[in-house]
Amino acid sequence: MLEDPLENVLNVVAHCLPMEQAVAVWDSALNKNLIDYPRLQRLPFNGVASQVLANVSRFADSGLESFVRLRLAWLKLRIVPQAWVLGHRVDYLIGDRLILLIDGSQHEGKQRRLDNAHDFELRQRGYEIIRVGYVEVMFDWPAVQLKIMQAIGLGMHLKKR
């Protein structure tokens, strides 16, 4: 059986896929503990692969989260991925109290009811929530970005005095 080492596959991915997709693949490898960041840092990546390495995070729980992280980097605000808030992980905490949640296909039925209960608890405690889904992130990003920018423009990310 012929098998290429993961490091070689990641290098090829970096050179063959657009940046967002390459970062999502690398993030997934880190998240699944198929490789660790110190090992990646020691490898002689160059060109676009070194750019991908500079953008990876082991905290991305899905490819959607990788895309969103890269798309929000320009904001220059404190953005905490996979933050713990009131005993639950949220996809992103922007500033002090704006929460961005990204729903995948698993957010239906019982999961949706649990999500709604947690959203209610977050709102009671003064957090603002933006919840978006796969289709919005992948096919209508400008509308998602506009929601986030409007919320920030209204100061919804800032701690209330």
Which residue stretches match the model-derived regions?
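Surface segments flanking catalytic/ligand-binding clefts of nucleic-acid enzymes
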Residues: 30-161
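Hydrophobic alpha-helical segments and helix pairs
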Residues: 1-34
